[in-house]
């Protein structure tokens, strides 16, 4: 849990002139050097080889240390950066994070220029790249379909059966081979995702999600690549075919039943749900690795599972907390972006309109000067309320821009993990995680490997 929100030995802010602190050219380069490895690993789709290299070089950890030094030099921020052709400010203070996220979308809009260029590759009418009335309508539609705010989705019974069946297939493979790695895990995970979102008829449509991955890989380059319009239209046509079945129990059925304003474009909301579920798979596998490396937490998780009927929807608070802690330790959205829609007053100065606000969640979650648990596995904080009271912890963002699929993702991941844990002993083969040592700032999900022994 957290300690004080500011280090006791931090000097007062110094700006050099009236207004918010302005980083020197050298410090702007240092900030860029901390952030660019995060971007290079893939903001929209993870680049497997780059993630591996970043982990070996501890680039995430180095970035945390750089931003710690900058917060000491300039105060916690916002610290304006000297970027050519772009106003930008680095947000290093928890209270500033709270303000920005609470005041989304006005005056802190989530549809930044960079985000519009990136997500335009596969969801140009998605809620994340929308503003004004269009955003409000699309957000309302997303919340209705995703059943935002409810731990168990109204279609949870059908979804739980899909999870149980696919986890059963994966479990049988694990028991036969004696191991679990990323490739086996993600194949099963995508089958779950396609069934939950589009229905059983999409279970084996690997081409659909492969096409989305290609579009997301292009989106990693944001404005540097032209839009793949023909590919996007092929992808949309395929999504539309699945939606037309409106299979009972799927999100596709919810779409068919939910009134939509002409601004919404229901087909264009689906890519975001598929996109969000992809990193959720990495979150789940990291959570499983962390559990196996921490025997006491693993025992508590097994006790929660007990003899529950996992083919039925189950609320599993401890496993949900484990997933949340996995996102806290290794955020799937390491950078949150907002853009000011007008000049904004701040203590000590004013930010101009069209300033990009860069919230480095991977740093805020791991700042050991302000967090006693920065580098250890602590699911309990998600159960006792401590994490929810900390504005620096934003695993699914926060405020009006909070992920509308948070509960659905937590239900799906926790249920999937419960099935994999039942009836087998697991041992972490890679990476090496010592529960007595600080956890690494980066854990490559593609390299996670567990040994499996069935117990009956």
Label each region the model flagged:
Residues 2-44, 74-80, 87-91, 95-98, ...:
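Cytochrome P450
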Residues 55-86:
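Glycine-rich loop/turn
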Residues 44-66, 324-328:
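Short, basic/low-complexity N-terminal boundary segments at the transition from targeting/disordered tails
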């Amino acid at each position: 849990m957290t300690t004080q929100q500011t280090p006791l030995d931090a000097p007062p802010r110094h700006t050099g002139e009236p207004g918010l602190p302005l980083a020197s050219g050298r410090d702007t380069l240092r900030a860029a050097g901390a952030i660019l490895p995060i971007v290079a690993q893939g903001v929209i789709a993870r680049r497997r080889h780059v993630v591996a290299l970043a982990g070996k070089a501890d680039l995430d950890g180095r970035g945390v240390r750089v931003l710690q030094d900058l917060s000491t030099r300039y105060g916690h921020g916002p610290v304006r950066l000297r970027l050519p052709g772009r106003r930008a400010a680095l947000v290093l203070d928890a209270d500033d994070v709270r303000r920005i996220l609470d005041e989304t979308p006005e005056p802190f809009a989530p549809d930044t220029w960079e985000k519009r260029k990136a997500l335009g590759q596969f969801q140009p009418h998605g809620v994340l790249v929308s503003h004004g009335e269009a955003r409000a309508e699309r957000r309302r539609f997303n919340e209705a379909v995703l059943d935002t705010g409810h731990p168990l989705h109204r279609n949870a019974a059908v979804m739980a059966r899909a999870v149980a069946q696919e986890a059963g297939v994966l479990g049988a493979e694990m028991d036969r081979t004696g191991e679990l790695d990323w490739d086996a895990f993600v194949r099963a995970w995508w089958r779950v995702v396609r069934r939950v979102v589009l229905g059983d008829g999409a279970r084996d449509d690997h081409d659909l999600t492969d096409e989305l991955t290609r579009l997301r890989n292009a989106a990693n380059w944001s404005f540097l690549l032209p839009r793949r319009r023909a590919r996007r239209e092929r992808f949309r046509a395929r999504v539309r075919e699945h939606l037309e079945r409106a299979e009972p129990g799927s999100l596709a059925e919810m779409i068919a039943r939910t009134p939509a304003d002409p601004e919404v474009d229901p087909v264009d909301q689906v890519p975001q749900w598929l996109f969000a579920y992809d990193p959720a798979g990495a979150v789940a596998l990291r959570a499983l690795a962390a559990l196996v490396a921490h025997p006491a937490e693993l025992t508590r998780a097994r006790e929660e599972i007990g003899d529950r009927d996992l083919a039925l929807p189950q609320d599993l608070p401890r496993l949900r907390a484990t997933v949340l802690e996995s996102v806290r330790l290794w955020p799937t959205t390491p950078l949150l972006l907002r853009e000011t829609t007008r000049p904004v007053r701040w203590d000590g100065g004013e930010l101009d309109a069209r300033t990009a606000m860069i919230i480095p969640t991977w740093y805020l979650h791991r700042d050991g000067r302000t967090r006693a648990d920065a580098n250890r596995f602590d699911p309990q904080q998600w159960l006792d309320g401590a994490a929810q009271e900390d504005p620096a912890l934003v695993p699914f963002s926060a405020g009006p821009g909070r992920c509308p699929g948070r509960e659905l993702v937590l239900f799906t991941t926790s249920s999937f993990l419960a099935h994999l844990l039942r009836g087998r002993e697991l041992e972490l083969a890679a990476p090496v995680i010592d529960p007595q040592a600080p956890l690494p700032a980066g854990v490559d999900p593609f390299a996670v490997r567990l040994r499996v022994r069935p117990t009956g």
